[in-house]
Amino acid sequence: MGLEAISTDYETVDVFVGDRVDGVATVELNRPNSRNALNGQLRSELKAVIDEVPETDVRVVVLTGAEDTGAFVAGADVTELRERDALEQREASKRPRVYEVIDGCPMPVIARINGHALGGGCELIQASDIRIAHENAKIGQPEINLGIIPGGGGTQRLPRLVGEGHAMRMILTGELIDAKEAQEIGLVDEVHGEESFDERVYEIAASIAAKSPVALEFAKKSIKAASRMDLESGIEYEAELFAQLFATGHKDEGIDAFFEDREPEWDDV
């Protein structure tokens, strides 16, 4: 079953495949009355959609908030948190959660940060592979203001992206930062105004989608391993993935296309 089919089954997630670029799925979070606050339903439906990606021909996922919601994700659903006790929270925290599913998706995930990405929204962009922000976006981990801490990986992924100092400041103060500062500290990769925002997001998506899907998956795995293994283990892992590519037709197609001065045809491999 493709993403086109399953997208109609959900109330809080919309999926558009190939509407902007062939091989690219735009996954829109859509809880307009709550600015995409992450409740159990939204987390579950987003996880289900991302789980389907490897079963399709999609090569890149663009994750974003629906335009009429006014946000990427404005945080967790505080009403839901208020009613939850410790036992219920432990159950809700069982892995793999949506953050791990995005992190582990074989296909690259681009976070199109079209508005505020707070709390769980900030953690969703941290789990993504490339982060492109609208110049008006605000980003932060304000959980400390509610007497809690980030619970979706923020205390672990954020320091790996921006360093311990910036992560401490953001998490301990709960202050929001603008897109420009987020880029300066390494939390987002690029910032664009309204005129160039979508153009750049889908330019990057198209560039990635044109590459070998097998090489993309292996490259993502190897890069992710850099923060999870010691250097020697990581180098050995990279070498093994590199060698495995020599057992695929993708290596042959890519090199043949280079010498024949043509675009590779990955679908025919």
Predicted feature residues:
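A structural preference for short, pocket-lining loop segments at secondary-structure junctions
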Residues: 22-30, 41-86, 101-111, 130, ...
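Crotonase-fold acyl-CoA enzyme core
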Residues: 103-213, 248
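Short loop-to-helix capping motifs
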Residues: 31-32, 211, 261
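Amphipathic alpha-helical segments at domain termini/boundaries
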Residues: 1-26, 175-208, 217-226, 254, ...
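Helix-loop "lid/cap" segments that line or gate small-molecule binding pockets
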Residues: 170, 182, 222-226, 241-246
